[in-house]
Design a protein with these regions (language model features):
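Mid-sequence, gly/pro-rich, charge-dense loop/helix-turn segments that line enzyme active sites
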Residues: 81-168
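A C-terminal functional module that forms or caps the active site or interfaces directly
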Residues: 155-193, 198
């Protein structure tokens, strides 16, 4: 049976999803509250992981070890790295990599974590398809599929943005996705990252982010609800085959 883990970083990203859940039982582990219940007919576990890569990875491991999730979705907001991506647009991850991991001194490619067999951690094709369909249902014509670039930094500087684009060729930047992707990858749990654009990751970001944070986060939560429904339909169809 499919059991979907949904991870958000902040209150604004998870409050809408929690309000849509039924049969909710909440458990606190390692400082985070895990809400187990049903979303759009699908068993889910929803957690607010907090900001940053360590918090995100910790919650993924708990979801895998303590709740037995079979699939993972990271929902939230991000800064645009692409001129064609405007505030309110949506990004579905093809893969995710770190923009602040650099072992090039030792001969590794930029972003490569020693011991890993990939630089960018690939999303699951089925989840990607479900996420894209859900995003297009909410905001037709405003969804891009591509790379999510992650680091422990809120990007509000055009020079930093330009460097991240050069190093990663990412579509958007945020602070949790690649850590979630790496932890899911190491646990062989399929994942996808879903991001709504809240700012342009440049010198306008400090002004745009507070204004559009809630709008972007609620849009992403709406897509996550539809994604759960798509996953339920997909697993039901697979069971019938």
């Amino acid at each position: 049976m499919t059991k979907l883990g949904i991870i958000g970083a902040m209150d604004v990203e998870v409050e809408t999803l929690l309000s849509e859940m039924e049969q909710v039982a909440s458990t606190k582990k390692a400082g985070s509250t895990f809400h187990e219940g049903v979303l759009m007919g699908l068993p889910v576990v929803l957690v607010q992981c907090g900001v940053g890569k360590v918090n995100a990875a910790l919650c993924v491991q708990i979801l895998c070890d303590c709740f037995g999730v079979t699939h993972l979705v990271n929902t939230g907001i991000a800064g645009s790295l692409c001129a064609e991506l405007d505030i309110g647009d949506l990004v579905v991850s093809r893969d995710a990599m770190y923009h602040d991991f650099d072992c090039t001194h030792f001969g590794y490619p930029f972003g490569k974590v020693p011991g890993m067999d990939v630089i960018a951690f690939p999303a699951d094709d089925t989840l990607l398809g479900c996420a894209f369909a859900a995003a297009e249902a909410v905001n037709p014509g405003h969804t891009r599929v591509g790379r999510v670039a992650s680091g422990d930094q809120f990007v509000a500087d055009p020079a930093v943005k330009e460097k991240i684009v050069a190093n990663t060729r990412g579509l958007c930047t945020e602070m949790e996705g690649a850590a979630i992707a790496q932890t899911a990858y190491r646990n062989s749990v399929p994942f996808v990252i879903l991001r709504a654009i809240s700012d342009k990751a440049d010198d306008s970001a400090e002004m745009d982010y507070p204004t559009f944070e809630k709008i972007a986060a609620h849009r992403c939560a709406e897509v996550a609800c539809k994604l759960a429904k798509h996953c339920l339909l997909y697993t039901s169809d697979a069971a019938d085959e």
